[in-house]
């Protein structure tokens, strides 16, 4: 695993290759951490503040996403563990299961007028795309039966 550092040079970050990788400020210090799934037998690790590696979970992920679900400035880590459902690591503290089903795709974004990010998941054909709104409940007005190849969230109309 390599990183392009300070727009100047490639620097090795870890000797293993990643199966999933994302970045987010999960400790609310203004600096992004690198969240890496190194695969079966190694699990998910976080590179904190460009200094130390810390294990986040021993299992490997089907998908990883981040978003500030409670609007406290710390990104929460969402992980689909195949066969175990969708889980969130909140505020660097505890794991909590968000759904017993394992989604095919996960993304986050603030898609309403509230301040926190929503979780948008694709549970696949027959179940569809669902939204976990305002850090409280699954939206029953989801796109039932619809599935996607990719998911994304953005404010395209400026509201």
Residue map of PLM features:
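Trp/Gly-enriched beta-strand/coil motifs that build multi-repeat beta-propeller-like domains
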Residues: 1-159
